[in-house]
Amino acid sequence: MGYGFALEQNACGWKITTRPAIAPFAELSVDFIGSYPDPATRLEPQLPELAFIGRSNVGKSSLLNALTGRKGLARVSATPGKTQTMNVFQLPEFYLIDLPGYGFAKASKVNRAAYRRLVEGYFTRRETLTGVVWLLDSRHDPSQDDLAFQQLL
């Protein structure tokens, strides 16, 4: 069984939790292939790639888990900046690519700049990139980083 999202309000604000649901990729085999710091890494076999992008902690990894119906497939954390490399998951006919978030992250300026270079390099060099899932936080107006990535897309 897959997982879906439930939005719950508590004393501290809103919380996104998972709940049983039908996940579109739940019946497919999904394998974690690896984490790569270089956007030029060539994946074999060459398959179309669907990338997940958005601010740090917007829910990219959680969405990937929900779509595949595998709660712990992509690592998630309440701490922004958990994903620091290009994390690759292979399905039978395509890859899901979990990218580092942009904006706030509990990392040094040097590391944040490296994450940004990885993401920008990924979008400008990947010939196998066929789709993008761009997550925006509806609680906030688009940031300067959101607008910059809009131009990149």
Language-model features, listed with the residues they occupy:
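Glycine-rich, phosphate-binding/catalytic loops in enzymes
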Residues: 69-70, 112-115, 149-153
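Conserved G1/Walker A P-loop phosphate-binding module
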Residues: 5-8, 12-104
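Short, flexible loop segments at the rims of nucleotide/cofactor-binding pockets, characterized by
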Residues: 73-75, 108-112, 137-141
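Conserved C-terminal guanine-recognition region of P-loop GTPase G domains, centered on the G4
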Residues: 120-153
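Conserved nucleotide-sensing/catalytic segment adjacent to the nucleotide-binding pocket
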Residues: 92-127
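Short, well-ordered secondary-structure micro-motifs
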Residues: 43, 107-108, 143-147
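Amphipathic alpha-helical transducer elements in NTP-driven molecular machines
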Residues: 83, 112-116, 143-144
